[in-house]
A protein has these predicted regions:
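Helix-to-loop junctions at the C-terminal end of transmembrane segments
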Residues: 74-86, 171, 285-297, 382
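Helix-loop boundary and gating motifs at the non-cytosolic
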Residues: 17-68, 235-238, 242, 246-264
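Juxtamembrane intracellular "pre-TM" segments in multi-pass secondary transporters
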Residues: 2-20, 201-239, 421-423
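Cytoplasmic helix-loop-helix junction between adjacent transmembrane helices
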Residues: 117-157, 345-346
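Helix-loop junctions on the cytosolic side of multi-pass membrane transporters
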Residues: 195-210, 406-418
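Residue-level signature of mid-helix packing/kink "hotspots" within the transmembrane helices
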Residues: 68-76, 161, 279-287, 371-372
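Symmetry-related core transmembrane helices of the 12-TM Major Facilitator Superfamily/SLC fold
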Residues: 179-197, 391-406
Length: 423
């Protein structure tokens, strides 16, 4: 017979301290999610050019196009699925999609397997990474969104960078396949197990925050949320276009940089180092820039970060020296650290809790569509004019996106604080 003690459920509260065990667990899980993507940062473009003999840059970057398109669509549906099925179930579904990926990369007999593996990786990343972001925001409440996002992205992209470094080192000793990809097998198994057995759903936290919102809102359809996030709300539009261009230049760097460095004559160990420095700097600084956006506001960090990214890309295109490329990678990491958590926090600020998960999924759709657009555009430009021209063109586009953000975005953190005080 149940007793009162057995029926008693733990109290639901918002905040990082109040939810630190689950928050810490989600940070660890996102590190494994990031590690799955890090497997590819150094290896896959070189597998295409060296093992499969691909000579077209556009064809080599096709794996990023498949990844970006599928991840963008997965992001788009992730918010809907999270609201309907619960965050935990969608997280587990993401890991299920990712389990075959390292095996496909190790055993791929031709390039079509690599493209298919990256489509599955896109599903996995779109669902699993989205859920770790959304669940942390659910747990943190409105006062610490920037810190929550910063810690999430820190864990994910630190794992991307360290895995890129590790796989580059292993590849220089053992070759491109299969030994460096064993890391991905471990990541997939551990991440799935943690998600199944230890994660708790956070919909009760959303209900608590929604109940304390300053004003009740009529339910919005997905189409209405899509329109608001894409173009109707000026802050959400500014964030969406900046996110798209941010990942556009990241997609370009993912596909073009290893080929660019290799063409100049760098070895796998040095290419791995350059590919690792950028996400490592990005990840570490997000611990600082996330909370700074809670204090200083989102807009200034986003605009300055986009312009710093543009400068770093231009420096890469104009130089032919490892030291300058290393400096440019550091600058690119700093700029991205300023932009990435601030954009997600800005979207959260401008979204009502009742449709925030869907708004974040729409933002992440546009942002990760940038991978596909960046890889395709950079590949076409590189085939026509060379690697340096492709990098410089994306630098110019990144600068223009910062201008659009400066003109369009209003400071979202001011609005968020006003809402907190009103409540």
């Amino acid at each position: 017979m149940p007793t009162a003690a057995n029926d008693r459920k733990p109290a639901i509260a918002l905040g990082l301290r109040e939810n630190w065990p689950q928050f810490t667990l989600l940070i660890l899980i996102n590190a494994f999610v990031g590690g799955m993507a890090g497997i590819e940062r150094t290896l896959v473009p070189l597998i295409g050019s060296e093992e499969f003999g691909l000579t077209s840059t556009t064809l080599v970057t096709s794996f990023i196009i498949s990844f970006g398109l599928v991840k963008a669509v997965s992001n788009l549906v992730s918010g809907q699925l999270a609201d309907r099925w619960g965050r935990k179930r969608v997280l587990i579904l993401g890991w299920m999609a990712g389990l075959p990926v390292p095996f496909m990369l190790m055993w791929a007999p031709d390039w079509s397997w690599i493209i298919a593996a990256n489509a599955l990786l896109g599903v996995s990343q779109g669902l699993a990474w989205s859920m770790t972001v959304i669940m942390k925001i659910d747990l943190a409440g409105s006062r610490s969104r920037g810190l929550a996002v910063g810690l999430n992205e820190f864990a994910g992209y630190l794992a991307v960078g360290l895995t890129a470094l590790a796989t580059g080192y292993l590849a220089s000793i053992y070759g491109l396949r299969p030994e460096p990809i064993y890391l991905g097998v471990a990541y997939a198994i551990i991440g799935t197990a943690l998600s199944v057995f230890l994660v708790r759903d956070t919909r009760a936290h959303v209900a608590l925050e929604t109940g304390g919102a300053t004003a009740a809102q009529p339910p919005l359809s997905f189409g209405q949320v899509f329109a608001l996030t894409s173009y109707k709300d000026r802050n959400l539009f500014a964030a969406s276009q900046a996110g798209l261009v941010n990942n556009l230049n990241d997609g370009m760097s993912w596909g073009i940089f290893p080929l660019f460095y290799s063409a100049i004559g760098l070895g796998l160990d040095r290419i791995g180092l350059l590919k690792a420095i950028y996400p490592i700097v990005w990840s570490l600084l997000q611990i600082i820039t996330g909370p700074l956006s809670d204090r200083w506001g989102r807009k200034g960090l986003i605009v300055a970060g986009m312009w710093l990214q543009a400068a770093a890309l231009l420096l890469t295109a104009l130089t032919r020296d490892f030291g300058w490329w290393l400096a440019a990678s550091v600058l690119l990491g700093i700029g991205t650290a300023m932009v990435y958590p601030s954009l997600i926090a800005a979207v959260s600020d401008a979204s009502h809790p009742s449709w925030r998960a869907r708004s974040l999924s729409v933002y992440r759709f546009w942002r990760d569509l940038g991978y596909a657009i960046g890889a395709l555009a950079a590949g076409l430009i590189a085939d026509a004019f060379g690697f340096a021209a492709a990098i410089a063109a994306i630098a110019g586009l990144t600068f223009l996106s910062g201008v659009v953000t400066a003109i369009t975005m209003q400071e979202t953190r001011t609005v968020s604080r006003a809402n907190e005080h009103a409540s």
